[in-house]
UniProtKB/Swiss-Prot annotation:
Listed EC numbers: 3.1.-.-
Cofactor dependence: Zn(2+)
Record-linked InterPro entries: MetalPrtase_cat_dom_sf_prd (IPR023091), YbeY (IPR002036), YbeY_CS (IPR020549)
Protein function: Single strand-specific metallo-endoribonuclease involved in late-stage 70S ribosome quality control and in maturation of the 3' terminus of the 16S rRNA.
One function term, GO molecular function aspect: metalloendopeptidase activity
Cellular component, GO annotation: cytoplasm
Organism: Parafrankia sp. (strain EAN1pec)
Record bears the keyword Cytoplasm: yes
Protein name in UniProt: Endoribonuclease YbeY
Amino acid sequence: MAVFVANESGVTDFDEVTLAALARFVLDTMKVNPLAELSVMLVEIDAMTDLHVRYMAEEGPTDVLAFPQDEAFEPSWSESPEEDPTTLLGDVVLCPEVARRQAAQAGHGMERELHILCTHGILHLLGYDHAEPEEEREMWKLQNSLLASWDTAAGTGAS
């Protein structure tokens, strides 16, 4: 599972290696093809604002955006990964400045918020959405379950 993290935000008070490990954990847990590739980009607030306006037609910055490589992609786990071509899942774009504000409001650290947002973005790449109430309940339940499993596996608590 290849996870590439590119920090273009200028924010450095989080662990990029841990963020990549979380992304791998989520993809493994969701049984995504082990040859899959994911990019996680962290950008400045101005860049996130531009992306949000351009791709979502919404003003202002947002916390996370997910750009699937292939809209028709169906994530799969293969018993013979060597038979599957490498799957480019897409990009998860995070904004640490927005994450920091949200973390303060939620009462936890920015790194925890980045973990929440990264997990959320990956779920969007895997086809989950929250446009309808039932979808939202399903996605949030799965997101919380994945994060709780990560906390246990990584030996961290929600912080």
